[in-house]
Amino acid sequence: MTDNPQVDAWNGESGRAWVEHADHFDRMLAPFGGAVLGRLGLRPGDRVVDIGCGVGATTLSIASIVAPATAVGVDVSVTMLDAARTRAAATGCSNVEFRHHDVQEEPMEAASFDLAFSRFGVMFFPEPDRAFANIRQSLVSGGRFGFVCFQRPSDNPMIMLPVMAAAAHVDVLATPGPTEPSPFSLADPDRIRSLLGSAGFADVVVEPGPSSGDLGSADDLEGAARRAIEQNPGIAPGFAAASQPDRAAAVAAATETMSRHIVAGRVVMGAATWVVTAHVS
């Protein structure tokens, strides 16, 4: 256990859920990561660090573009990093490396990367000012930084509605404050600009990102509901600890909620995200 419940969750139930359903989550989140990568303009030879790389899909995708340079994925979840390494070995990718690394607590080597990227991996820092300063010092002069993060909870039914339905039956963690570590800690675009500017980044651009998420086939509504619960660090521990009847009730409630959001045979729910880019001057 650590003093950061988010880190504990990603090394616990949420991390295990992401490993179990990695292909599903990669498909669901690909448009969000792609929105960032499309703005960064990766080139062969770029040295890239993928922050909060999880099970490694984005790092492997980056590696395929920047070869012969190495793409480095860092994460605090040992569980997910083990899966990432297994994936890399299975693909035969040789220009990728995965490191257990807390970007906030452990500065990376100075000027060791041309570009830093993150798909929903920078919202969980207890001290984001330190984390962003460490990312800044890891980049060369002229280096680029891009990430995607969520806007306000109320604008993200994709995340909130299944959890709110399930919360009537299983325990959830206390709701974090608006700037405390959580998926929504960077919802305020002015805060993003302030944090990055203070860290030494220039030309900070905050733009709306993808506005919906595909949570899976309508033929597997119950599976989609279970995944939505198990991957969420705010409710996954309580769901795992609950009795079987309570877990079943939670999944049933989330399933009913998600059944109202079927489009062309898919479960499609609204999202609100920011795509953020910045440079090192």
Question: Where do the model's predicted regions map?
Answer:
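Conserved catalytic/acceptor-binding region of the Class I
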Residues: D129, R144-S217
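Helix-to-beta-strand junctions that scaffold the AdoMet/dcAdoMet cofactor pocket
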Residues: F125-P126, L139-S141
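Class I SAM-dependent methyltransferase SAM/SAH-binding core
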Residues: R47-E106, R130
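Core SAM-dependent methyltransferase catalytic element
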Residues: A199-A202, A225, W274-S281
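A short acidic, Gly/Pro-enriched loop at the edge of an enzyme's catalytic core
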Residues: Q104-L115
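Conserved class I S-adenosyl-L-methionine
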Residues: M1-D46, A57-S61, M80-A83
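A short SAM/SAH-binding and catalytic strip from SAM-dependent methyltransferases
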Residues: D114-D129, Q151
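C-terminal helical/coil "lid" or tail adjacent to the Rossmann-like core of SAM-dependent
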Residues: D3-V7, S14-H21, D203-A264
